[in-house]
From Swiss-Prot:
Disulfide bonds join 23-76, 31-73, 102-176, 242-408, 377-393, 381-395, 397-407, 497-510, 525-534. This is Perforin-1. It is found in: Cytolytic granule; Secreted; Cell membrane; Endosome lumen. Monomer, as soluble protein. Homooligomer; homooligomerizes to form a pore-forming ring. Ca(2+) 2 binds at residues 430, 433-434, 436. The record marks 214, 344 as: Important for oligomerization. Ca(2+) 4 binds at residues 486, 490, 492. Belongs to the complement C6/C7/C8/C9 family.
Amino acid sequence: MAARLLLLGILLLLLPLPVPAPCHTAARSECKRSHKFVPGAWLAGEGVDVTSLRRSGSFPVDTQRFLRPDGTCTLCENALQEGTLQRLPLALTNWRAQGSGCQRHVTRAKVSSTEAVARDAARSIRNDWKVGLDVTPKPTSNVHVSVAGSHSQAANFAAQKTHQDQYSFSTDTVECRFYSFHVVHTPPLHPDFKRALGDLPHHFNASTQPAYLRLISNYGTHFIRAVELGGRISALTALRTCELALEGLTDNEVEDCLTVEAQVNIGIHGSISAEAKACEEKKKKHKMTASFHQTYRERHSEVVGGHHTSINDLLFGIQAGPEQYSAWVNSLPGSPGLVDYTLEPLHVLLDSQDPRREALRRALSQYLTDRARWRDCSRPCPPGRQKSPRDPCQCVCHGSAVTTQDCCPRQRGLAQLEVTFIQAWGLWGDWFTATDAYVKLFFGGQELRTSTVWDNNNPIWSVRLDFGDVLLATGGPLRLQVWDQDSGRDDDLLGTCDQAPKSGSHEVRCNLNHGHLKFRYHARCLPHLGGGTCLDYVPQMLLGEPPGNRSGAVW
């Protein structure tokens, strides 16, 4: 028995000591002292529009009151600020100062569509924000619908880009977490919000809709229930897929090197030396005179939390570097931002017996449905493309010698070349009969031939002779030779016409040795190419409704 007690005592000594709760109830005298609120206390209980992810700046929940009726309050010891005692508002509970802080690591996410950017922007929402609402925008199996984050700055940036050209998107992110807490089950409402609710009609219909929309405009659609506070740096880079293909690069290669450069700017060197060296080799190979983030600089950057007013991009900005990053990290415990959070719709703050609760629920549901954005995936792909088996909203190509699976040309100068009409007149090939004429056509190592027009000095060939995909600038002249057919081995060449082809439709006239020639040809640059010889990069703009439409914009 004694041995058992001794063993139990040893085991108890080996157990970790209980961590003291950081918060305690303080007496009236201690509460009257000049204590600050816990950092970021005002962030919980604030209104948010879930479609734009914009904080409204208005507060449905009152986070200013901290004294109980008996004069006591809750004070919390902030280990991240030298154990300073700080006030916890009555509306908040379960406050914790987390020790995880910042990891010096850049995470990357690759997306290929605007709705994927919207989903990525809304990933900070850690719960199902739709609970209790009826959000049913344009229900159909061939439509991709986005609501949360659909009007966020990142989604608007991506939508604008995808209407300008073919893009892929890459997000580099650094996150830090320092504090967590949440709003109590039945929080005190802010006096202004109470007054706004009091002004609402008891029912929601077409005539009362403006009053409810006014409330949503001021307060948002949801309030923040629980938070994780700290900081986040995110850089969303837009990459022109086909321009990269013409430069002999893939979006994955560029994204890898962007992440490497971001890691260097936050002070990571040793563990990525091999990757950094590989990126330097790529720069030399492709004759790049600037860094990857300077070369590919179509970017939307956001910094959440901390002091950063002079630097808006801490990963790729001109002034970005380890010192600036460390200064930002050091400012986060005193000035944290919203990293992750849960949301609840505003109507749950009203009493279940209040008729305005159901009216507000219906107003929120209607507003969110109207704000949804979608992409119609039932539209057919352009000629030469097909639906992706992985994503019915994406059109892809069969990879070939001249195009990638992303439907991008593999090199500059590519065009489709065809001769569409040939006419000759005044030919003289035989002494005693009219000419038996045919035409040979040459370009880029190819030879095509017309049929023979018998016994005619003024023949016409209304045919299409297609050279297919050619290199317009380097394929040599487009050469037409007019021949008089005899026995086949001693045919007579009546003349040659050479023309350096240019993009577009053209008519050419030539004088032959024995007659005259006229022909028409058409050279069409492959998509994303332009200029006289198709050497220029040309963005491919999307047809259809541009982004930014308030109600149901199509992506």
